[in-house]
């Protein structure tokens, strides 16, 4: 922890007395610049704050490197900024615990004989599975991925639907995060050539070793390489429960990290294995009161991670749930992501949930999408033949 440091100055922009289009362009310029900003690892500060003053509202822009703060930490930062800005100061700056304390604790714990035994069992659990674990979903991805621009698609689950989904999850012995994860997997499988694949699920590794553990800032992220196997002989709720059970099993063996799993998969397959489809949920990590008691409004947010193509993020906001995909925009065929996200959103928001759970094929394309697919379908008789036979016939 730095003993001596200077808090960087906050850049202030006055965006007044201009047309709505000019205002929008100016805000987009600020956002794009902050999104693309590269921070030097190990060099203070790894964050930036700027303010835009409009005629009727003030916008605080926050940019940071997620090496210093995971998604839950960002919520903590925003909550504390808001509390102080609106004069509702809590006892947030008298914490007994620091992120450094957690790192030291973890380092010392790994030296304990009991932890060594846990590590041994967890390593065995993963090594027995790694050789048969599938790679990422086989979606139609363009080979040239030089364009790294990120686009966000989002949807909001209102309070009434949120409570309906929560009850549905409780009644079926699954978590709400697990249900949303299963919807994400269902959509990936629909557009994937393979129905058996792995997803990168980020976990907040905040063990309750201290009362302050959920109020400190740092990167507590661990990743889990979650195997998905879509068996369409099962109902959707059975597939959800299968995914939930697999996730719970994996979570019991987290001392062997997802990074180590990927490293071993790479070694066995003799090629670099990347799982670029990510799922992150902070549901139930903060109290409902904290997640709904915001005075300000979240206008824009986006994240980018090297090699990630789609990052599905789920968080409580106001009285509902905000769900977004941060997508590598140029990686996929035109309109595919819009169709996939629309399908995903409709599963969460509009679908008759009870019927969906009992159904085997839960993805129902809207009529306009069905028409597009129908036009592109061409049925030719399939005649099996050897590779050289077509050449000889010509």
What does each model-found stretch correspond to?
Residues 72-81, 177, 195-202, 220, ...:
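Extended, hydrophobic beta-loop-alpha segments that form or line the acyl/peptidyl-thioester binding
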Residues 24-30, 74-75, 101-104, 120-124, ...:
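AMP-binding/adenylate-forming domain of the ANL superfamily
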Residues 32-35, 78, 166, 177-185, ...:
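Short amphipathic alpha-helical segments
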Residues 52-100, 333-352:
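Active-site-proximal acidic secondary-structure segment that organizes catalysis
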Residues 1-25, 29-33, 37, 43-45, ...:
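Short amphipathic alpha-helices and their capping loops
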Residues 107-112, 248-250, 265, 269, ...:
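Flexible, non-catalytic linker and terminal segments flanking ANL/adenylate-forming cores
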